[in-house]
Amino acid sequence: MGDLPGSGSTAQPRDAAVTGTGGNSTAGGGSSVGSTAVDRPPSPARLSHTSEKHPKVTLTELNMLRRHRELCDVVLNVGGRKIFAHRVILSACSSYFCAMFTGELEESRQTEVTIRDIDENAMELLIDFCYTAHIIVEESNVQTLLPAACLLQLVEIQDICCEFLKRQLDPTNCLGIRAFADTHSCRELLRIADKFTQHNFQEVMESEEFLLLPVGQLVDIICSDELNVRSEEQVFNAVMSWLKYNVAERRQHLAQVLQHVRLPLLSPKFLVGTVGSDLLVRSDEACRDLVDEAKNYLLLPQERPLMQGPRTRPRKPTRRGEVLFAVGGWCSGDAIASVERFDPQTNDWKMVAPMSKRRCGVGVAVLNDLLYAVGGHDGQSYLNSIERYDPQTNQWSCDVAPTTSCRTSVGVAVLDEFLYAVGGQDGVQCLNHVERYDPKENKWSKVAPMTTRRLGVAVAVLGGFLYAIGGSDGQCPLNTVERYDPRHNKWVAVSPMSTRRKHLGCAVFNNYIYAVGGRDDCMELSSAERYNPLTNTWSPIVAMTSRRSGVGLAVVNGQLYAVGGFDGSAYLKTIEVYDPETNQWRLCGCMNYRRLGGGVGVMRAPQTENYMWCENSFKQPNS
């Protein structure tokens, strides 16, 4: 394959085909007198065409007719506002209108139809959507749009409203959004709001919405095994805060609620000193029985096997798992800006917001729960710019200071709260320069250079050292390895790999450094090896199922993933995962895009399931 695009590569996937016209022909297209071809009837000429513009143009013209009130055959009276429309358009978009206008209902024969229980502004927006396929959902209209979309059975609008509300979730409003979702039967939003409430319960319990909960919803929350609390004391304190917000009306529910607090899991000191001494608890016989049950559980450990039940079961909150991001790279002959996210729990790749620039040979690392994309090549220029991604907002920002040198095929890693950029090339030469970024100062500063120039280098952090592994010195691939000691600002050589590798993948897994794939002097590689820092030795592991140069390697939820690359003939979107116990690789699905020379990064899954980005998405405010 040679070096990555942007560094002199001319490699392309071998999937092009040469096509030509069938039948007999002569040079210049002239006919041949006496040819036997005249004995056969010529094939009829055909040209098949499907217009991509036609649907949009047709809708635009229909909307113009509506705006001018031409050929309209129905008027919707909504809250005193008259909205002109065409029955066929409304029926095609809405099952509600289809049933109204094509059945035997009285409205099917009326030219003016009154619609009740829908906000007139929401109806106007929904009718506009039927004609334009465009809508803006925002905080000021979502609470009227969603009920209207539910009534009119506009599923697409229901979904986008729910997605908008998911993005708005925070500890102060998640209970209100949950109730709203429940009222309008939005099951997915209800599920997400429940998960958010459980995970953020320690903040939710401080909100006014929590204090206003009806007793049934309070019970639903505190009985969950997945409630995320440091101890059961927090659950008891939350219940008592809720009770004391309106003691006169709520004290009758104390026993009903307290039975879902896992009193046997409290410390003896808290159970006796706080729960047992509370006047409201002591004044209720059923509550006293619950306290006595908890005391017996704590005082009689030999009897605990006979006392097991919901109140003795420890809570097991669902921890946010890790997700893998694939960033930029080279695809279909050009650098790309696209970014996608892999969730191992669902085995699903989803597009997220793209970078502002196309980047191949980009260095990627995670620092302070933010994903950094460093340098690369945009298909025309070498870059020194940096972008930073926040998974909570699904947005990239470009306010990060640039590196002092342009760099593509650069290695990037985090050590001691600094972001390091190692080697690469600047379009003139292969680099041994190393610099590090301080996020507090938003500033890059140079550190000691490597002893060897390296592009396509892999970097890893283990035991307080930064390792630079393989790459190319601009002439040939390397198997040498050196490591940086930040305490002495010095690079020292360690044992070399068994194989020369440039554009390899590298990751730390179970206290080993794994190096996989890449390219040697002749071909793309599937081989893999790992480094033991205790013995300063490299040892081989089983080869991957595919040759992969320009591959990304990352550890996600305790598993090692190899992502994308180039196999010598085609760019890859396949993924494989390594099992150290069986020493085997297995295929694990595909990305949406083929990627060579993209970066990979691993982060905790965001607390809210934000919008996934797509080119045809609805317009969203501030997105």
UniProtKB/Swiss-Prot annotation:
Probable substrate-specific adapter of an E3 ubiquitin-protein ligase complex which mediates the ubiquitination and subsequent proteasomal degradation of target proteins. May have a role in synapse differentiation and growth. It holds the Pfam family Kelch_1. The modification Phosphothreonine is found at T19. Kelch repeats lie at residues 323-369, 371-417, 418-464, 466-511, 513-558, 559-605. The keyword Phosphoprotein applies. Pathway: Protein modification; protein ubiquitination. Keywords: Actin-binding, Kelch repeat, Phosphoprotein, Repeat, Ubl conjugation pathway. Residues 20-32 have a biased composition (Gly residues). InterPro entries: BACK, BTB-kelch_protein, BTB/POZ_dom, Gal_Oxase/kelch_b-propeller, Kelch-typ_b-propeller, Kelch_1, SKP1/BTB/POZ_sf. Residues 72-139 form the BTB domain. GO terms for molecular function: actin binding; ubiquitin-like ligase-substrate adaptor activity. GO terms for cellular component: Cul3-RING ubiquitin ligase complex. GO terms for biological process: negative regulation of synaptic assembly at neuromuscular junction; proteasome-mediated ubiquitin-dependent protein catabolic process; protein ubiquitination. PANTHER family: KELCH PROTEIN, KELCH-LIKE PROTEIN 20. Residues 174-276 form the BACK domain. Gene3D superfamilies: 1.25.40.420, Kelch-type beta propeller, Potassium Channel Kv1.1, Chain A. The gene is dbo. Residues 1-54 are annotated as: Disordered. This is Kelch-like protein diablo. It comes from the Eukaryota.
